[in-house]
A protein has these predicted regions:
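Calycin-type beta-barrel ligand-binding domains and close structural analogs
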Residues: 1-203
Length: 203
């Protein structure tokens, strides 16, 4: 249930400030202005932190996902990106590097292609170093958080938790990943049933 790991999603870049109350009012998630600077900020390394969903199959996927990173690279054409995903699904590390993202600037939409499957996403405006992912499936909603590093600040976490409450989730419904479950570097020993993978070095 993270960017590029679920079939239908809406990407939200960063966190939109909200305040948690007994009856929270959600701060509006505003689509990003898809200028060159915004598109360029999508490039690089991201770490999936946590997520929650009302859609049972997505909840099952999140429970299997122990840790994940993804890196977005320039593609062959303008407004086309290549994506490499490295994730631990239960005890197995998996690398996927065949998906692409197409950017449609006129409506802040991203289309993610993986094989024969495609999903549309709307990029939302906020902090350049964070992703909130808002996704929809059969009238179900979900949110997930990614960041440039495995750690987020207390303030950033509180803002995301407020958004969870705004969308009807209890905090205990959020499923959190842990850096201790990161896939090992090449050559390290792994447990039975696991596959060691190395993350690409960032230049």
């Amino acid at each position: 249930m993270l960017a590029f790991l679920i079939p239908v999603l809406s990407l939200t870049m960063g966190l939109v400030r909200a305040h948690a109350t007994d009856s929270p009012t959600c701060a509006p998630l505003v689509p990003a202005e898809m200028d060159n600077a915004t598109v360029h900020r999508l490039l690089g390394h991201w770490v999936y932190i946590m997520g929650a969903s009302q859609y049972p199959p997505h909840v099952a996927e999140m429970k299997e996902l122990k840790y994940a990173t993804y890196t977005i690279f320039p593609g062959r054409h303008e407004d086309e990106f290549n994506v490499t995903e490295i994730m631990r699904l239960n005890e197995t590390c998996v690398v996927r590097n065949t998906s692409k993202i197409h950017v449609f600037r006129h409506n802040s939409t991203l289309v993610h292609e993986e094989g024969q499957e495609a999903s549309m996403a709307e990029l939302m405006h906020s902090d350049k170093d964070l992703f909130i992912l808002k996704h929809f499936k059969d009238n179900h909603v979900g949110l997930s958080l990614s960041a440039r590093t495995p750690k987020v600040t207390k303030e950033q976490l509180e803002e995301f938790e407020a958004q969870l409450r705004c969308h009807g989730f209890k905090l205990e419904e959020a499923i959190i990943t842990s850096p201790k479950d990161a896939c090992p570097a090449a050559g390290e020993e792994v447990g039975e049933g696991s596959t060691a993978t190395a993350e690409p070095q960032q230049g």
